[in-house]
C-alpha cells in the first residue's frame, strides 16, 4: 500500500530505540519513552518551509502526529511544523 501525505504533512517511520541500558538492563516497552527520531518516508506536495526529503532522519515533537500502521509497520503522519531538526551524520 502506498500512502502519500497531503498538504504540509510528512509520513515518517519512528526509529527503534535501544532496548538495553548501558548497564545491560533490558527495558520493557512500557518503561521506554516514545521515540522522537524518525526517518522520512514521504513528503507532502506543499512542504516548502523545511528542507527535508525522503530518507532524511529527523527529530520531531514528542506528542505530534497521528500514528498509523501499514502492513504491520508503524508510521506517523506529522505536520511539517512539528519537525524540529534534521539529523546529519
Swiss-Prot record:
Pfam family, one: Cpn10
GO molecular function, one term: metal ion binding
Alphabetical UniProt keywords: Chaperone, Cytoplasm
One of the record's GO cellular component terms: cytoplasm
Subcellular location: Cytoplasm
GO biological process: chaperone cofactor-dependent protein refolding
Alphabetized SMART domains for the sequence: Cpn10 (SM00883)
InterPro entries: Chaperonin_GroES (IPR020818), Chaperonin_GroES_sf (IPR037124), Chaprnonin_Cpn10_CS (IPR018369), GroES-like_sf (IPR011032)
Known function: Together with the chaperonin GroEL, plays an essential role in assisting protein folding. The GroEL-GroES system forms a nano-cage that allows encapsulation of the non-native substrate proteins and provides a physical environment optimized to promote and accelerate protein folding. GroES binds to the apical surface of the GroEL ring, thereby capping the opening of the GroEL channel.
Summary of subunit composition and partner proteins: Heptamer of 7 subunits arranged in a ring. Interacts with the chaperonin GroEL.
HAMAP family, alphabetized: CH10 (MF_00580)
Similarity field: Belongs to the GroES chaperonin family.
Protein name per the record: Co-chaperonin GroES
Gene giving rise to this polypeptide: groES
Amino acid at each position: 500500500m502506498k500512502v502519500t501525505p497531503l498538504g504540509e504533512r510528512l509520513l515518517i517511520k519512528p526509529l527503534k530505540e535501544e532496548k538495553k541500558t548501558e548497564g545491560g538492563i533490558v527495558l520493557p516497552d512500557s518503561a521506554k519513552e516514545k521515540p522522537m527520531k524518525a526517518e522520512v518516508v514521504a513528503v507532502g506536495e506543499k512542504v516548502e518551509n523545511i528542507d527535508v526529503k525522503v530518507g532524511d532522519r529527523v527529530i520531531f515533537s514528542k506528542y505530534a502526529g497521528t500514528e498509523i500502521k501499514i502492513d504491520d509497520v508503524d508510521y506517523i503522519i506529522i505536520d511539517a511544523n512539528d519537525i524540529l531538526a534534521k539529523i546529519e551524520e
